[in-house]
From Swiss-Prot:
Keywords: Cell cycle, Cell division, DNA-binding. Residues 272-303 bind DNA. Gene3D superfamilies: Homing endonucleases (3.10.28.10). GO terms for molecular function: DNA binding. The lineage of its organism: Bacteria, Bacillati, Bacillota, Bacilli, Lactobacillales. Pfam families: HTH_WhiA, LAGLIDADG_WhiA, WhiA_N. GO terms for biological process: cell division; regulation of sporulation. Belongs to the WhiA family. It comes from the Bacteria. Involved in cell division and chromosome segregation. InterPro entries: Homing_endonucl (IPR027434), Sporu_reg_WhiA_N_dom (IPR018478), Sporulation_regulator_WhiA (IPR003802), Sporulation_regulator_WhiA_C (IPR023054), WhiA_LAGLIDADG_dom (IPR039518). This is Probable cell division protein WhiA.
């Protein structure tokens, strides 16, 4: 099950669709038709539970007994698509939900009454997500929530609702419609709280924390590996120089303070500068050891 499906099923498992949720779903996923008996309404979804909720909502709010039809997509994913269809009281339903103008292109935005009411806005966002929303799986490490709209002004209305909840929503116009999106993990988690998907919010945060912890450990390990590599590289250069001095002039001819450092470096090529300093018969600072190693390298360069 994808993360998007998990979020939608959590929402649908909590309550029946509200008036404003129903309005958003029909506006974003509904299609009006005309038959000999009058107007028809079809609402299309790939979510079987949402189709069932729509059927129950039509019956509960309007005493409309709709049909649930389904077919298989012919694309690669071959998803099953559900259509909730009715030809009963469609005009009454559209009028009651203030959607009549939407389907005839006269009003493509969001009703001002919804934009100005927090609870109505919350419910509308929930319905909009159920209809056309998606969230990238947090396991991917790339956070994105999208709600697609047919009309740009509707997408902008969705953004306004999100911004009322202090979410950094943006709108992108596409060839076919527009999308309202969030990209910050914190905004996506807050959105899940807004629509009441608390379990999904906790799951999202858990995955996010695990990923960040793994990334921090990887960065620390990479830094440590790089430090070790630099230490070994510097150590091998010095060891080669010490071997050169030994072959040409003999280590015994080095100043006494350099002889001990040279011997220790040969015996312990993996030691850090601090470990070399701690191993000397007379304790020395790291800068002191570095100074002596530079002297040894200079002597070798001059041979």
């Amino acid at each position: 099950m994808s993360f998007t499906v998990a979020v939608k099923e959590e929402i649908l498992g909590q309550h029946h669709l509200s008036w404003h949720e129903l309005s958003a779903i029909i506006k974003m996923s509904g299609n009006i038709g005309l038959s000999t008996s009058g107007l028809t309404l079809s609402v299309v979804t790939e979510n079987a539970k949402l189709a069932r909720h729509l059927y129950e909502s039509f019956l509960h709010f309007y005493e409309i007994k709709s049909e649930i039809r389904h077919h298989q997509r012919s694309n690669l994913r071959k998803n099953r698509v559900y259509t909730v269809f009715t030809d009963e009281k469609v005009q009454d339903l559209l009028s009651d939900l203030h959607l009549a103008d939407s389907f005839f292109g006269l009003e493509t935005g969001i009703d001002e009454a919804i934009l100005s009411d927090e609870e109505a806005g919350r419910a509308y966002l929930c319905g909009a997500f159920l209809a056309n929303g998606s969230i990238r799986d947090p396991e991917s490490g790339k956070y994105q929530l999208e709600i697609s709209s047919v009309y740009l002004d509707h997408a902008q209305g969705i953004a306004s609702l999100l911004q009322q909840f202090l979410l950094d929503a943006k709108v992108l116009e596409r060839k076919k419609g527009a999308v309202t999106y969030l990209q910050r993990a914190e905004d996506i988690m807050d959105f899940l709280i807004v629509i009441g998907a608390m379990q999904a919010r906790d799951d999202f945060e858990r995955v996010k924390i695990l990923r960040e912890t793994r990334n921090d450990l990887n960065r620390a390990n990479n830094a440590e590996t790089a430090n070790i590599a630099r230490t070994v590289s510097a150590s091998m250069k010095t060891i080669n120089n010490i071997s050169k001095i030994k072959d040409i002039m003999g280590l015994e001819n080095l100043p006494v303070d350099l002889q001990e450092v040279a011997q220790l470096r040969i015996q312990h090529p993996d030691y850090s500068i601090q470990q070399l300093a701690d191993s000397l018969s007379t304790p020395l600072t790291k800068s002191g050891v570095n100074h002596r190693l530079r002297k040894i390298n200079k002597i070798a360069d001059e041979l």
